[in-house]
């Protein structure tokens, strides 16, 4: 392992240098980000994935969609389409991407769109939906051509960006100091047993600026499953099942299900995995005498491919703050920008 890290170190330095030059060009206004009058709330991260950005977007939609006319703009990673695409009733995970399709399915009253070029995406949204009061920008941390009014950076408790390194030696898309652009740092996936001392240790390692806020939150799993039917989670304890995941970090989910003493076989695939008919056929073969449980994100990709004879469920998740005061402070900080 030390040899591998040694060999990757020069490549990481070169990659980091390129990102530093890029950020410097924006910092010196040689390249100028576009700022819109309509409030833009950005959510992003420094790491390559698995920090809970989508859960944060979902949380914000749930919290504010009844008070404001919201839209969501994402890149639509892994989609088969190109350019600006507006989410519609006949959209799929293939045409929109996993996360945008999930937002569209869960929040049909919200405008959802995808575009590689976010500036053009925002322009399209505002031209087509002139009454839009705010736009949530998904995965926008490194998309410097657009300037959010407020930027939320997500990083996990067990692997904060302060303990990581740039690609390919580590998982960071840019150097740690890029976090200075964020207004809010959300420490996601905080363990329930984390003590105040543990949280203070994380805070100190981040070396926050005076204008930055930090909040700790966890992933809360629903007490029910959905999909083939809506039923209590405890009902699946009666037999062994197949767990299928295609996300960046399935470890917390696996740990949670094992903690409930559920008996299952885990079929793990890479993040945003494009399930083929052959792969789905093998999954169905394993699930002949049982059912399949998956994540809400993977459900959108699997559902069109899975035979209706096979029971396919997903376990919803949501963002949960460690205390009500922190949650209220976070919501007020967001709402101040939406007003």
Regions found by a protein language model. Give the residues of each.
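A transmembrane-helix-recognition feature enriched in membrane-embedded lipid enzymes
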Residues: 1-38, 337
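C-terminal accessory "lid"/substrate-recognition subdomains
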Residues: 2, 160-291
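Residue-level signal for inorganic ion chemistry
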Residues: 14, 54, 103, 138, ...
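Walker A (P-loop) phosphate-binding motif
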Residues: 23-89, 191-192
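Hydrophobic residues at beta-strand termini and immediately following loops
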Residues: 43, 113, 155, 217, ...
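Conserved beta-strand elements of the Class I
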Residues: 71-73, 153, 240-244
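Phosphate/Mg2+-binding loops and adjacent switch elements
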Residues: 77-208
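Short, flexible loop segments at boundaries between secondary-structure elements
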Residues: 220, 270-274, 309-337
């Amino acid at each position: 392992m030390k040899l591998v890290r040694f060999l990757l170190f020069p490549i990481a330095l070169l990659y980091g240098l390129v990102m530093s030059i890029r950020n410097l060009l924006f910092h010196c206004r040689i390249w100028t980000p576009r700022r819109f009058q309509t409030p833009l709330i950005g959510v992003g991260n420094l790491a390559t994935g698995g920090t809970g950005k989508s859960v944060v977007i979902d949380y914000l939609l749930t919290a504010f969609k009844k008070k404001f006319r919201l839209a969501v703009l994402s890149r639509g990673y892994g989609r088969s389409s190109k350019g600006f695409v507006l989410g519609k009733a006949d959209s799929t995970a293939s045409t929109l991407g996993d996360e945008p399709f999930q937002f569209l399915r869960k929040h049909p009253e919200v405008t959802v769109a995808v575009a590689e070029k976010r500036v053009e995406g925002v322009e399209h949204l505002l031209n087509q939906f002139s009454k839009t009061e705010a736009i949530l920008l998904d995965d926008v941390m490194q998309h410097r051509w657009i300037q959010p009014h407020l930027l939320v950076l997500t990083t996990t408790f067990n692997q904060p960006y302060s303990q990581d390194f740039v690609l390919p030696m580590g998982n960071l898309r840019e150097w740690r100091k890029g976090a200075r652009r964020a207004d809010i740092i959300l420490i996601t996936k905080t363990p329930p047993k984390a003590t105040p001392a543990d949280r203070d240790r994380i805070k100190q390692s981040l070396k926050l600026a005076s204008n930055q806020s930090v909040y700790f939150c966890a992933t809360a799993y629903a007490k029910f499953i959905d999909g083939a039917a809506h039923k209590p989670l405890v009902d699946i304890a009666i037999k062994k099942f197949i767990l299928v995941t295609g996300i960046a970090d399935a470890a917390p989910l696996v740990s949670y299900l094992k903690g409930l003493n559920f008996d299952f076989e885990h079929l793990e695939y890479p993040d945003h995995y494009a399930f083929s008919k052959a792969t789905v056929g093998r999954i169905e073969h394993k699930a002949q005498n049982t059912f399949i449980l998956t994540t809400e994100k993977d459900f959108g990709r699997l559902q069109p491919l899975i035979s209706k004879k096979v029971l396919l469920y997903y376990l919803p998740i949501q963002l949960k703050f460690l205390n009500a005061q922190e949650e209220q402070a976070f919501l007020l900080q967001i709402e101040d920008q939406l007003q």
